[in-house]
Each structure stands twice: as structure tokens, then as C-alpha cells.
């Protein structure tokens, strides 16, 4: 009985810590940045109880030795509609704390994802987005990605290659390449909490890659927990920590994801 009591207390403490961490990240820091690792999975269910609408709130805070980068942040509200097993559309509002406004929406994204291959252990999808810039000196952007997923016995490996091209402004001729890997371990480490290794690499312009010291690389660990699992109130929470690998990257970033289906 005593062991069960301690196990229950530890499980409850983990849940409570996760909730307070999210509240702390969301409201205590003044926030300017954005991480997302897309995967080729289409959010769609044939269950009549699910309307195939999905909502995600995510963001991250940068901790950096440079004063202009320290405690900067960026949040995203994403709305997803799954139309069938092959196709979904996404709408994103990017919310940032800018110098001339306490709350601004510097970017709006209109996205489409289509799945081409959906085998037992391998998925491949393409992703296209038109990114509308709302700030005066910013450029609209076309973003497209090739997304892969390999399923192994003990883990799932997602990796995506993203291409970003400004379609107006002085940098409109440049296309930037980014890489987003994620390894998700199937077996929970404790109390239905799963571990993941994730990161992002910005190689610069594909016409002439930046040298390593001028690239941006961040990698680290994350944990995922599903609350109220298999109930109408089910919600996913992910918290991650990324470490910059070179001087051009942010020293550290704290990331959160909250997902809910309807």
C-alpha cells in the first residue's frame, strides 16, 4: 500500500509540474521565435465522434548570452482540418511581442499537406505553405517541405527538409534550406511519459551554404504526456529543451506544445 501511495504521489507530481511549467512559460516571460517539427502523418479519423478539427498552441523562449536575444519569444496558434486520410489544411497565427506593440501578428500561414506514401513502416508527405508577412519591412514567403517517417521496433524517426523562399523584398532570390529531425521512443520512460530527441538545422542559402560557424543548429530532449487519454477531454502536452551547438544559434530554447482534437 505504501509503495502504491508513493507511486500515485510521484505520478501526480509529474502532472502538476507539467501544468505549472506550461503556465510559467506562457505568462512569466516577455516573449520572439518559432520551432516546429512537421511529420508526414495526416490528422484524420473516421470515427463519427471526431469532427477532424485540431488545435495546437505552441511557442518557445530563447535564453541567450546576447542581451537582444535573451528571453525573446514567439507563440503560434494553429488550426487544422483533416479532410481525408491523404489531405489536411492548416491555418497558423504567429503572435510575437514586438517593440512597438505588446501583442502583434507578424505572420499568417496558409498550409496544405498531402500524403503520398502510407505504408506500415514508412510514410512520405509533402507540405506547402504561403506565409503572409504583416510587418512593413518583412517579405511574404513560400515554404515547402518533404516529410519522411520511418517506424522501427523501439522508436519512430521523423525527418523533414524545408525550403523557404521570399517572394518579395531584397532577399527574394534566396532559398534557405532547413532540416528537422525527431526520434520518438515508443516505450514510456515513466507514467505514460515518452521521450524524444529533436532539433533543427539552418544551413543558409542553397546556392551557397553558409560555413558551419554561420549556420544555426539546436538539438535537445523533449517529453510528451497525454492527459485524459481515450476520453473526449484528451489533450497532449510536450515540453522540450534545445541547446545551441554554435555561436550563431540561440544558446538555449525552452519549447512547449499543447494539442487538442475536436
Which residues does each predicted region cover?
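Cleavable N-terminal export/targeting peptides
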Residues: 1-38
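Transmembrane beta-barrel domains of Gram-negative outer membranes and organellar outer membranes
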Residues: 31-171, 176-262
